[in-house]
């Protein structure tokens, strides 16, 4: 499976998370996953909450439209973004490569 997949208007992201980073950003590819750096530590679900907030802001959707499908407790996650309003250029480039 690729890092980014468009499925019935939703975006499926296979992510590798780097917690406790200096800033929030989509870094690029990490193997077959998209690497995302976030500032939150991986303690008591703070990283997941922060990741959901960051992705919601990035894709201009409510936090309730960000779903962690797999990897709740690990660095490797599969995320579903319901009907994203904006898709960042780094992700559209990856989608173009996999088409």
UniProtKB/Swiss-Prot annotation:
GO cellular component terms listed in the entry, alphabetical order: cytoplasm
InterPro entries per record:
DUF167, YggU-like_sf
Alphabetized Pfam families for the sequence: DUF167
Source taxon at top rank: Bacteria
User: Which family is this sequence assigned to?
Assistant: Belongs to the UPF0235 family.
Q: Check the record and name the HAMAP family matching this protein.
A: UPF0235
**Designated name of the protein:** UPF0235 protein Sbal_3028
């Amino acid at each position: 499976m690729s890092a980014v997949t468009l499925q019935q208007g939703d975006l499926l992201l296979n992510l590798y998370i780097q917690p406790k980073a200096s800033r929030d950003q989509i870094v690029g590819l990490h193997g077959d996953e998209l690497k995302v750096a976030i500032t939150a530590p991986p303690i008591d679900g703070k990283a997941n909450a922060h990741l959901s907030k960051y992705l919601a802001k990035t894709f201009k959707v409510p936090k309730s439209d960000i779903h962690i499908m797999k990897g709740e407790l690990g660095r490797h996650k599969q995320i579903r973004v319901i009907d994203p309003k904006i898709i960042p250029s780094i992700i559209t480039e990856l989608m173009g490569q996999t088409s």
